[in-house]
């Protein structure tokens, strides 16, 4: 039994393995040396250097003017930001395991027979492999198409030369796109910062506005309490005066009532001598009591409190006119009015 053959992966496994060994930049199998990023993704060192240089165009090393500061770029697979020191990509660790796997894979592929159909065949000449590139039509084709077929009058070139050129062009495009993605990510970060700062500034001005209105509420409440206190004081003074008058009139009423009772009792006295003895003083007291009825009175409208009314329409209008940026406009308007008044005074003086 061939135990070794059982260790060799089948075709599908080899294809899956090959996909894992493809560089996301050049889209080819990793070229040694292979470097591993902090995010655990792998790149050819050359490809890593290409995107690093594209993202940091002013950073040079290995023969150029050495920049003492590092740079950064983003992993093309996961967009994780990779921060470099002054050594650049040469400071990244090599992935020797991946390099060994590549060697084993290549050795296994070289020992396997070439599968039928692994090389693209010409559609016009099914037995011919595609081995040249038509520069005129910009399509790959076979030699028979150039000699006998549709591309006789076209300019062609070896497939390998065009292959290498377009690979290089595609790699450059990828590097340019990755650098562009980094710039877009930078813009996104700046816009996110703008959102954050906008929210912070909005919160700050809201707080300031709330404090200013709270101060206005406090002034209004203080003024309201002051004016209500003045009304209450006036009310108490008037009530004290009225209650004092009521007390005086009640005392007078009580005296008059007693005199009336005494006078009625005197009228019931049957004896003339007895009646005459008390009648004269009683009449005198009644006359004096009648004169005492001329006590103080309240003036007409004494109860009126209308003089405490307020006209707050102009203040209400000023409150309704509150808006952002009106302070400078009002100051400018007041300055204009003062200038107009000064001009009017100077004109009258000349006349």
Swiss-Prot record:
This is E3 ubiquitin-protein ligase TRIM63. The lineage of its organism: Eukaryota, Metazoa, Chordata, Craniata, Vertebrata. A zinc finger (RING-type) spans 23-79. SUPFAM superfamilies: B-box zinc-binding domain, RING/U-box. Pathway: Protein modification; protein ubiquitination. Residues 189-269 form a coiled coil. Residues 326-351 are annotated as: Disordered. The RING-type zinc finger mediates interaction with SUMO2 and localization to the nucleus. Also required for the E3 ubiquitin ligase activity. The B box-type zinc finger mediates homodimerization. The gene is Trim63.
């Amino acid at each position: 039994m061939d135990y070794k053959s059982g260790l060799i992966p089948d075709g599908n496994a080899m294809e899956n393995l090959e996909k894992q060994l493809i560089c996301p930049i050049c889209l080819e199998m990793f070229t040694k040396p292979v470097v591993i990023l902090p995010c655990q993704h792998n790149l050819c060192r050359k490809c890593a250097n290409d995107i690093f240089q594209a993202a940091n165009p002013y950073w040079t090393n290995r023969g150029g003017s050495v920049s003492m500061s590092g740079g950064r770029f983003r992993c093309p697979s996961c967009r994780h930001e990779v921060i470099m020191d002054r050594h650049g990509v040469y400071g990244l660790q090599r992935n020797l395991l991946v390099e060994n796997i590549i060697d084993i894979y290549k050795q296994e592929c070289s020992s396997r027979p070439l599968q039928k159909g692994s090389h693209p065949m010409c559609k016009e000449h099914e037995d011919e492999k595609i081995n040249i590139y038509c520069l005129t039509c910009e399509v790959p084709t076979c030699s028979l198409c150039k000699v006998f077929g549709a591309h006789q009058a076209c300019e062609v070139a070896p497939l390998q030369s065009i292959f290498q050129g377009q690979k290089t062009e595609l790699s450059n495009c990828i590097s340019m796109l990755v650098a562009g993605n980094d710039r877009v990510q930078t813009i996104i970060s700046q816009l996110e910062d703008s959102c954050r700062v906008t929210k912070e500034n909005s919160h700050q001005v809201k707080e300031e506005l709330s404090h200013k209105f709270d101060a206005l509420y406090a002034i209004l409440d203080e003024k309201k309490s002051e004016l209500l206190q003045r009304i209450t004081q006036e009310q108490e003074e008037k009530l004290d005066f009225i209650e004092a008058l009521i007390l005086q009139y009640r005392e007078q009423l009580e005296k008059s009532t007693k005199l009336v009772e005494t006078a009625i009792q005197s009228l019931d006295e049957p004896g003339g001598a007895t009646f005459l003895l008390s009648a004269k003083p009683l009449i005198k007291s009644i006359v004096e009591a009648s004169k005492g009825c001329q006590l103080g009175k309240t003036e007409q409208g004494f109860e009126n409190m209308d003089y405490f009314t307020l006209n707050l329409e102009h203040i209400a209008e000023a409150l309704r006119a509150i808006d952002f940026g009106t302070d400078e406009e009002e100051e400018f308007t007041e300055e204009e009015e003062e200038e107009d008044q000064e001009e009017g005074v100077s004109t009258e003086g000349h006349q």
